[in-house]
Amino acid sequence: MDPNMQNMMSSYLKIKKLVGDEGSDFEEEEEGEDEEEEEQERVVKVNFAESQLKKKKLNLGEGSGGKSGEKHTASGGGVVAQPCCLVENCGADLRNCKKYYQRHRVCEVHAKAPVVSVEGLMQRFCQQCSRFHDLSEFDQTKRSCRRRLAGHNERRRKSSLESHKEGRSPR
């Protein structure tokens, strides 16, 4: 079993142990300040543990959805997506690649390629947006879309003008 999955399962079992078998017997409990405080403490611990478990699931890529190409976990609870390149007919396994490529679901080759086919459209990966755009959004062979390059150039011009005003030479 995957170590992360094993860790999640042990967290789940701890939560289950905290909650115990008290599911529907809450109304039959004796009323007393000590017991109420203990119950409140238990609820806080369970809520905290559940939130930690949800965070772990999200960090592992589990959550909603059940697309093909994903594997189900042993517990049957969530789905873990196999990281693979979005480019058609690529399917490169990104598990051994850098986190950047896993996060954006593109292999290193296609991140730098001038033209790729994604969802039937000829596109290019923008290194500024970290997304695929139509080729019409790029100038010649540049890897950043016009919109992001315009913003970058504007910031450069602005800093250059400010340095002239202060009497410094431009960079």
Swiss-Prot record:
Record field: compositional bias (Basic and acidic residues): 159-171
Region annotation Disordered: where it falls in the sequence: 20-46, 57-76, 149-171
Residue ranges of coiled coil: none
Organism from which the protein derives: Antirrhinum majus (Garden snapdragon)
Motif interval(s): Bipartite nuclear localization signal: 142-158
Biased amino acid composition, Basic residues: 149-158
Protein name: Squamosa promoter-binding protein 2
Entry text on domains: The SBP-type zinc finger is required for the binding to DNA.
Listed PANTHER family: SQUAMOSA PROMOTER-BINDING-LIKE PROTEIN 4 (PTHR31251), SQUAMOSA PROMOTER-BINDING-LIKE PROTEIN 6 (PTHR31251:SF226)
Zinc finger (SBP-type): 82-159
Pfam family, one: SBP
Binding site for Zn(2+) 2: C126, C129, H133, C145
A cellular component annotation (GO) from this entry: nucleus
Binding site for Zn(2+) 1: C85, C90, C107, H110
